[in-house]
Every structure is written in structure tokens, then in C-alpha cells.
Regions:
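Residues that define the transmembrane beta-barrel architecture of outer-membrane proteins
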Residues: 35, 56-62, 99-103, 124, ...
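Bacterial Sec-dependent N-terminal signal peptides
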Residues: 1-25
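Predominantly the C-terminal beta-signal and adjacent terminal strand-loop region
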Residues: 89-93, 98-100, 176-207
């Protein structure tokens, strides 16, 4: 569990821009929440948990999310993400890459609004998200590594889909009523076949 949260922190560095329509209604000294759609653009880094050093398994990542904020606390988003995953083989030591794209549906919970109420001018709003996704892998570099005749039971040769669960934390920094910069770290828990190696436990992709 400690390692999980360390990865979340490590990949919460690249910023994400969030654009939203007007989210408040003003009336003579009162401000009311207005449900609204939003758009999120993200770029950063990812890490595929595997048998290699941490830095060797870092790869680029990008995401696009479209969502809707139903209440000050609760929202949903539909997104597409992915780019590249990496894996490592121990003997002889080798690295390989594979490409993937992922669709995801997340539930969002604004912790600032949950515990402090709706405040449209709040500078920093932490949030939690959880959901599910489907990753579609292709161009698997594991097909070309030297395994000394060891049979990779979970090797996928061309293309393959993987169901997964998602969870993560984020922080929204308000720039204006319509724009925010977001720092987010998350993990996707995928089928054991994702990195082509059998480990009898789920594969993890952090970004």
C-alpha cells in the first residue's frame, strides 16, 4: 500500500488543464452551484510495474476527458488515455515496449466541497476518482525479446484488450471561473496478461 501511494505522488507532477462552463449562479449576495460540463487535457508520464528499475519503466502518457459536474461534490467523466507501456525481462536483462489506448469512465468526488461546502472561489480543491477502463494493446515488443527458450505463457502477439479498475487522487488549482490547473496521479489495475508475463496477480499501470 505504501508503494501504491508513492507512485501516485510521483506521477502527480505533470499539469492537466480543466476547462468548464459557468458553474455558478449569482443572485443579490447569494451564489448557487450550477451543473456544468467540463473538458480536461492531460500530458505526463506513466510507469508499468515490472521486473526492472523504476526509471527504466517510465513512458509517456496523454489523456483527454469529457465530463459533467452534477453537484458540488459529485461528477463523472468519460476519457481516452494511453500511449506506451514498458516491461522488463531479467535473464538476460532486457526492456521492451508496447503501445496501448484506453477508454475509461470515472466517478469524481470533490473532497473540498464534501467537507467544506460549495465555495466557487476556493483556490485548491482536492478530489478522489474511481472507475473502470478498457485498454487495447498493440505493437507488443515482448515478441522480440530473448527469453532463452522460456515460454511466455501470457504473450500476446498482435492485439489484445484488457479490462481494468481505476483509482486515484488529484488537486485542482483555480485560475478563473472557467479554467483550472490540475495535478493528478492514478493507477489502473489490469489483467495479468497486460505486460505479457505471468505473475499470478494483476498488472499495474500508474500515470
Amino acid at each position: 500500500m505504501k508503494k501504491f501511494f508513492l507512485y501516485l505522488i510521483a506521477f502527480a507532477l505533470p499539469p492537466m488543464v480543466s476547462l468548464a462552463q459557468e458553474r455558478q449562479i449569482k443572485e443579490k449576495g447569494k451564489t448557487f452551484f450550477k451543473p456544468h460540463p467540463f473538458l480536461q487535457l492531460q500530458g505526463g508520464a506513466a510507469h508499468t510495474l515490472g521486473e526492472a528499475t523504476f526509471m527504466d519503466l517510465i513512458s509517456p502518457a496523454a489523456a483527454l476527458n469529457l465530463g459533467y459536474q452534477f453537484t458540488p461534490v459529485f461528477g463523472m467523466r468519460l476519457g481516452a488515455s494511453g500511449w506506451q507501456g514498458k516491461g522488463g525481462w531479467v535473464a538476460p536483462a532486457q526492456l521492451y515496449e508496447f503501445q496501448f489506448v484506453q477508454g475509461n469512465l470515472d466517478l469524481l468526488f470533490d473532497l473540498g466541497a464534501l467537507f467544506g461546502g460549495f465555495k466557487p472561489k476556493r483556490a485548491i480543491s482536492p478530489y478522489l476518482f474511481a472507475g473502470g477502463g478498457y485498454a487495447y494493446g498493440f505493437e507488443n515488443g515482448a515478441t522480440a525479446i530473448n527469453t532463452n527458450d522460456y515460454d511466455l505463457e501470457y504473450l500476446w502477439m498482435e492485439k489484445r484488450g484488457f479490462l481494468g479498475g481505476r483509482v486515484g487522487l488529484g488537486m485542482s488549482v483555480r485560475i478563473s471561473d472557467a479554467v483550472a490547473i490540475i495535478l493528478e496521479g492514478g493507477a489502473t489495475i489490469l489483467d495479468d496478461h497486460f505486460n505479457s508475463k505471468r505473475a499470478n496477480n494483476p498488472d499495474w499501470q500508474f500515470n
